[in-house]
Amino acid sequence: MFEKGSTAVLSTSRLPFIVAVKNAGLYSFEKGEWLLQYPLSHSIYKLVGISPYIFGIGDNGLIVRYNPYNNKWTHTFFPTPQRLWDITGNESGIIITHVGSKLYISYNFGSNWSVIHPFKELSIKPFIRSLFLYKEHLYIGTQINRESGGLWSFSLESGELTLVKKESNSMISSIYIDCEDCMFIAKGNARSKEGSIEMKSLRGSRWRTFEQTISEKAFLDVFNVGKNLYTTTSKDEYGYSRIYEINKQRHILLPIETIEGHGFRGAGCKDELFISSPIESKWIDRSYEMTKLVH
């Protein structure tokens, strides 16, 4: 049933992993045991826990929500044929996702939505690829756009748009900010093979690129497990991608595992990691250095 792999994964306090199995729905996964939570024929590309809710987004404007108060999953669609890549929010009820170059924002955990055009003053508007809400600032990573591509900061209070990092030839596929106010971005360009992980302090302006021993076309996801950070990549010419541990102190990427296909998303729970690829899913138990394919 799982030979097609998965496209997104989330670790929660209630379940070690919730997995979006490609074109099949949402499953819980615990120690090798699968249980269907919500059947769905559309693929989901990001799952996020925004306490106390869970949200997912995917193909054709899909948005999924789990409501813990009635223990139910529901889904609907934004009016677009586009794939949604990212969703972010906070515990006060702000939820933000994207369609093309515009934002959909809710102030009540997805019950009602309105549209914001952060790039309305730009003559060439980039498509959005990644989002991260930090306090009142929304950080926006774009798809490749020579004129307007890069990392942007949008103030939810004033509506001011600020270019944080210009990128003419790379997409920014993932953004993460840790508890020490350090920002990490995952970059990629399949044509030029110029993927990288970069970091800077929110209080500074200098970007540092992490050293890597293997050239990667693109890094796709950055996720944390406790105090540890990890990243996934696109597949190489042999059809395999890698999972790296991000060593913040030494500014290096440490390869720890491979997976067939693009490593779309990753998540972790204690010593366990789960990596989602559309070809296969991989469960890694680092306490015993044990790896299992769970496709």
Each predicted region: which residue ranges?
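Conserved Ser/Thr-centered positions that define the repeating blades of beta-propeller domains
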Residues: S28-F29, R65-N67, S106-Y107, S153-F154, ...
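Blade-level signature of beta-propeller repeat domains, shared across WD40, Kelch, NHL, RCC1
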Residues: G261-H295
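Residue-level signature of beta-propeller blades and closely related beta-rich strand-turn architectures
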Residues: N23, N60, G100, I144-N145, ...
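Solenoidal tandem-repeat scaffolds enriched in leucines and small polar residues
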Residues: F109, W113-D178, F184-E194
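Entry beta-strands of beta-propeller and related beta-repeat scaffolds
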Residues: L15-V19, Y53-G56, G93-I96, H137-I140, ...
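An edge-strand/N-cap motif at the start of beta-rich repeat modules
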Residues: M1-Y38
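Repeated scaffold domains used in trafficking and secretory/extracellular systems
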Residues: E3-R14, H42-I50, P81-E91, I124-F132, ...
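A short beta-strand motif characteristic of beta-propeller blades
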Residues: M1, E33-Y38, K72-F77, W113-E121, ...
